[in-house]
């Protein structure tokens, strides 16, 4: 018995000594004092992006941490982000650190978001950009986005009329409405099914699917010690068992959806297109590859868009002058006789600025998705050894007072400075940057901007009287609003025309 206790401890001591001796060879960025074996894991209390910002204030725009046996480098500077995401550095830094969640949920790190840099990832990226997320294909699915937004507006209008016959303001909770909108948008594009609202398919499966997406986001954002202290696996791992069960449940749903699309040979969905490619190249387009692409689309395009919309509406309610300015722009440019369309977004710069300001203050991936270099490299003059976990604290960059005037203020007018979009490339990074930029960025921006513009155009909005809005963020990969958004709304006259 004593042998089985001492052997792991001996292994831990040897590993620590080995790691420490290797560290001495490198000129690593500065960082706070660490504890033996655990490093800084004991300090990682949520919200982690705020903690990392405090460390950057103390140690500078690049600093080191240690999570168990893993080195971590945190970047909090646009210039260092640019250095990391351009040229040869971007190639070296285009891999992902291996994590338990990705192992069991993302088909052993083979999805576009989790795969190591190499031929397989490049193929997946090409499929995303050319086959399922191309401008042509997004235009083909425009009718789905338009239909789902109209359904949401109609549902909200009927609810206000049912709850309030005097046409006064009605109290609503926005999170379920926005969540149903974004889930239906993506699931219809991917599989052709509607899960939420009216005319739905399989409510039980729908609720399980939404729960799994939420669980995956929470577990992906978890700073779990088993990822950094492998020796803990010898003592059993509840986290690993839970993640494995989540991955199995998600795979079961994805396989059912794939089989349904395979039976529907006339379907015009992203999955049907991938099935046609599978028939041409069965050796590459396996079911696992297709399910991985399905999951990537659904995880990246559902929860994230709903969270962004909720933050946007929260900020508009806290800043009624911004809401009024956005509404006036829509009324002036679009009129009051028809619903805003995707083609109108180009002539609504203030609405676009509102979305950009929401991305700045409330990025759904506050420190992006971590990367890991495939070779030793340098950033900011410091050594970054191979396999280091590199995190870019976009949340802190977005709120840096040296970059942004009054950084905590929600001010869409700040983008009217004439600097142009290139000026903000490494100052505003809600979708990441470089080779691992989110391939669904264009789709996400379309959904968020069109839905937000429609809510502004079709309803009057007020904050709930007597309630002080809590703007705290929750834990997890997607930076949800801790307290679900409640608001008062009333249909504008345009809604009566839309419902005719």
From Swiss-Prot:
Where in this chain does the entry annotate a coiled-coil region? none
Chain segments annotated as transmembrane: 1-21
User: What are the UniProt keywords, alphabetically?
Assistant: Heme, Iron, Isopeptide bond, Membrane, Metal-binding, Monooxygenase, Oxidoreductase, Transmembrane, Transmembrane helix, Ubl conjugation
Annotated metabolic or biological route of this protein: Secondary metabolite biosynthesis
Q: Where does heme bind?
A: 438
Q: What class of enzyme is it?
A: oxidoreductase
How this chain sits in the membrane, per its record, is: Single-pass membrane protein
Q: Which organism is it from?
A: Arabidopsis thaliana
Question: What protein does this entry describe?
Answer: Cytochrome P450 81F1
Family annotation (SUPFAM superfamilies): Cytochrome P450
């Amino acid at each position: 018995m004593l042998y089985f206790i001492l052997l792991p401890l001996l292994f831990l001591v040897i590993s620590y000594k080995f790691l420490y001796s290797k560290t001495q060879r490198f000129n690593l960025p500065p960082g706070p004092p660490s504890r033996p074996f655990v490093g800084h894991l004991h300090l990682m209390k949520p919200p982690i992006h705020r903690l990392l910002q405090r460390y950057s204030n103390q140690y500078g725009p690049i600093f080191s941490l240690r999570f168990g046996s893993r080195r971590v480098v945190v970047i909090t500077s646009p210039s260092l982000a640019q250095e990391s995401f351009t040229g040869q550095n971007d190639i070296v830094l285009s891999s992902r650190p291996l994590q338990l969640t990705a192992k069991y949920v993302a088909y052993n790190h083979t999805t576009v978001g989790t795969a190591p840099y190499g031929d397989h990832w490049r193929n997946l990226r090409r499929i995303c950009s050319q086959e399922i997320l191309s401008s042509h294909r997004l235009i083909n699915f425009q009718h789905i986005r338009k239909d789902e937004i109209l359904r949401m507006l109609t549902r909200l209008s009927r609810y206000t009329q049912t709850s309030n016959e005097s046409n006064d303001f009605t109290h609503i909770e926005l999170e379920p409405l926005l969540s149903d909108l974004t889930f239906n948008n993506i699931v219809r594009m991917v599989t052709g099914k509607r899960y939420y609202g009216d005319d739905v398919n399989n409510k039980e499966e729908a609720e399980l699917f939404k729960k799994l997406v939420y669980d995956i986001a929470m577990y992906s954002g978890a700073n779990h010690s088993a990822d950094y202290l492998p020796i803990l696996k010898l003592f059993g791992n509840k986290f690993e068992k839970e993640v494995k069960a989540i991955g199995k449940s998600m795979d079961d749903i994805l396989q059912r959806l794939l089989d349904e699309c395979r039976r529907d040979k006339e379907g015009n969905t992203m999955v049907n297109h991938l099935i046609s490619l599978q028939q041409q190249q069965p050796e590459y387009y396996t079911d696992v590859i297709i399910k991985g692409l399905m999951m990537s689309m659904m995880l990246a395009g559902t929860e994230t868009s709903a969270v962004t919309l909720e933050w946007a509406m929260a900020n508009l309610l806290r800043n009624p002058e911004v809401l009024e300015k956005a509404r006036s722009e829509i009324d002036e440019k679009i009129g009051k006789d028809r619903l805003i369309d995707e083609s109108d977004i180009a002539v609504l710069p203030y609405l676009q600025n509102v979305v950009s300001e929401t991305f700045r203050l409330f990025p759904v991936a506050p420190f992006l998705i971590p990367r890991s270099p495939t070779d030793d490299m340098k950033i900011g003059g410091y050594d970054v050894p191979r396999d280091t976990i590199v995190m870019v604290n976009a949340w802190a960059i977005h709120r840096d007072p040296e970059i942004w005037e009054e950084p905590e203020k929600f001010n869409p007018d700040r983008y009217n400075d004439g600097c142009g979009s290139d000026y903000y490339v490494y100052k505003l990074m809600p979708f990441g940057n470089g080779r691992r930029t989110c391939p669904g960025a264009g789709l996400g921006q379309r959904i968020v901007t069109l839905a937000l513009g429609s809510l502004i155009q079709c309803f009057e909005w007020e904050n709930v009287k007597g309630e002080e809005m809590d703007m705290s963020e929750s834990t997890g990969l997607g930076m949800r609003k801790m307290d679900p958004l409640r608001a008062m709304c009333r249909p504008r006259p345009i809604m009566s025309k839309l419902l005719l």
